[in-house]
């Protein structure tokens, strides 16, 4: 996930698809208008200020390894996760895992986020 203003589109505008989610608040999935691959999602809790970018859509995905694996309770048994990266069965409390700088960035986003 990253601040929306740090995401640079190389061409075109994504096609936004409103999709139900387990929270009941839904999510907006932004897709490439040509191939329809999901590029990022926006979840209701974070609004439009944070994008959950699909790392496989980046020019250099190897530069952005995961910080944590989530929802591992539903992973396939043949998927082997490295022990060097935290893994949790569902979601997690950010303050338990995120570095101080990331927590500060989240705080800044929340304080700048317009009221709904």
Put a short name on every predicted segment:
Residues 1-116:
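A short Gly-Trp-Pro
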């Amino acid at each position: 996930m990253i601040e929306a203003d740090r995401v640079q589109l190389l061409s075109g505008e994504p096609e936004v698809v409103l999709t139900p989610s387990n929270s009941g608040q839904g999510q907006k999935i932004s897709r490439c208008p040509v191939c329809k691959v999901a590029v990022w999602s926006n979840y209701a809790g974070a609004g439009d200020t944070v994008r959950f970018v699909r790392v496989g859509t980046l020019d250099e995905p190897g530069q952005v390894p995961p910080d944590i694996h989530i929802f591992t309770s539903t992973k396939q048994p043949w998927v082997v996760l490295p022990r060097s990266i935290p893994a949790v069965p569902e979601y997690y409390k950010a303050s338990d895992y995120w570095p101080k700088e990331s927590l500060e960035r989240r705080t800044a986003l929340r304080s700048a986020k317009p009221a709904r």
